């Protein structure tokens, strides 16, 4: 077996943008900043955000309606 082929692991302090902090093993370093975690992700919190897709579709059709008229 080869020696010294595994990356160095650190006891990392992970900090989320929402302020949640946790400790885990990581090869990235001792401090890891993340944008989203299980405390603030909509899937885990149940706070879903609905996007107004109808308005976006109407804008798309209005914008590209002139290209369909040339036929």
From Swiss-Prot:
Residues that hold Zn(2+) according to the record: 16, 18, 37, 40
GO molecular function: metal ion binding; rRNA binding; structural constituent of ribosome
Lineage top rank: taxon: Bacteria
Cellular component GO terms held in the UniProt record: ribonucleoprotein complex; ribosome
The entry's keywords: Metal-binding, Ribonucleoprotein, Ribosomal protein, RNA-binding, rRNA-binding, Zinc
Cofactor: Zn(2+)
PROSITE patterns reported for this sequence: RIBOSOMAL_L31 (PS01143)
InterPro entries: Ribosomal_bL28/bL31-like_sf, Ribosomal_bL31, Ribosomal_bL31_A, Ribosomal_bL31_sf
Biological-process GO terms, alphabetical: translation
Entry note: cofactor: Binds 1 zinc ion per subunit.
Assembly and interaction partners: Part of the 50S ribosomal subunit.
Entry's family note: Belongs to the bacterial ribosomal protein bL31 family. Type A subfamily.
PANTHER family: 50S RIBOSOMAL PROTEIN L31, CHLOROPLASTIC (PTHR33280), LARGE RIBOSOMAL SUBUNIT PROTEIN BL31C (PTHR33280:SF1)
Protein purpose: Binds the 23S rRNA.
HAMAP family in UniProt: Ribosomal_bL31_1
Protein known as: Large ribosomal subunit protein bL31
Organism: Nitratidesulfovibrio vulgaris (strain DSM 19637 / Miyazaki F)
Classification lineage: Bacteria, Pseudomonadati, Thermodesulfobacteriota, Desulfovibrionia, Desulfovibrionales
């Amino acid at each position: 077996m080869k020696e010294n082929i595994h990356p160095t692991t650190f006891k990392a302090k992970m900090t989320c943008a929402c302020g949640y902090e946790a400790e885990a093993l990581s090869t990235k370093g001792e401090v890891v900043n993340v944008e989203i975690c299980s405390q603030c992700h909509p899937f885990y919190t149940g706070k879903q955000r609905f996007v107004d897709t109808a308005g976006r579709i109407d804008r798309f059709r209005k914008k590209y309606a002139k290209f369909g008229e040339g036929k």
